[in-house]
């Protein structure tokens, strides 16, 4: 694990949502690393692209792009080679392969996915919802959410919320801390929409120690203390039992696996 922050530029001649979703799915696999992701949408000219690439060079950023314009795509790829930058061309290979197999010439028109996909605006709304109601910022969100996630610190509440939001679900989450008052709204939510996240004490201890080290702090703190962690988990488990909600141990599960369990649970109740 590195203490440094990895800069990532997501560049697109459309809104950049495809690239952002892809890089988010990748970065959540590295919970002990720090990433600074910036999106540069509607980049449709070489002159505009040059300024962004020069900034990426100064910051030694990873570049992920989803250009459908071959000229812009080639420009970024060549810039990366010339300046020893890591460039991820997320779309060209897909389009070229489909063109070869179908024998059809691609339109090379930006944003067609969003124009043709009726779920696009639903997902954008869900992503905005997840950001607004992350970390228990506004308890009213629990009553509006499709899914409510509960969990102690470092149980992947936020990345899981964003992943589910990208599937179109409105998600609100609440961090659980012993001796703090649980918002009354939680008790008003249908238990079938609440999911209690937990983790193994040893896993939490390791994650929290590494987090302290990444900040240049002493890893042996109250935050990473095993007795404290066990108290937190006991507090969470008792609450889950009181609410009658589904409990999910995320210790050995990826974000995608946990999300699948949640979605399957929701679908089984419909």
From Swiss-Prot:
Catalytic reaction(s) noted: N(tele)-phospho-L-histidyl/L-threonyl-[pyruvate, phosphate dikinase] + ADP = N(tele)-phospho-L-histidyl/O-phospho-L-threonyl-[pyruvate, phosphate dikinase] + AMP + H(+); N(tele)-phospho-L-histidyl/O-phospho-L-threonyl-[pyruvate, phosphate dikinase] + phosphate + H(+) = N(tele)-phospho-L-histidyl/L-threonyl-[pyruvate, phosphate dikinase] + diphosphate
Binding-site positions, ADP: 151-158
InterPro entries documented for this protein: Kinase-pyrophosphorylase, PPDK_reg
EC number in record: 2.7.11.32, 2.7.4.27
Domain of life of the source: Bacteria
Entry keyword annotation includes Transferase: yes
Keywords noted in UniProt: Kinase, Nucleotide-binding, Serine/threonine-protein kinase, Transferase
Pfam families, A to Z: Kinase-PPPase
Keyword Transferase: yes
Gene Ontology MF annotations: ADP binding; ATP binding; phosphotransferase activity, phosphate group as acceptor; protein serine/threonine kinase activity
Enzyme class: transferase
Record PANTHER family: PYRUVATE, PHOSPHATE DIKINASE REGULATORY PROTEIN 1, CHLOROPLASTIC
Function: Bifunctional serine/threonine kinase and phosphorylase involved in the regulation of the pyruvate, phosphate dikinase (PPDK) by catalyzing its phosphorylation/dephosphorylation.
Sequence similarity: Belongs to the pyruvate, phosphate/water dikinase regulatory protein family. PDRP subfamily.
NCBIfam families associated with the record: PRK05339.1
Name the UniProt record assigns to this protein: Putative pyruvate, phosphate dikinase regulatory protein
Species of origin: Ligilactobacillus salivarius (strain UCC118)
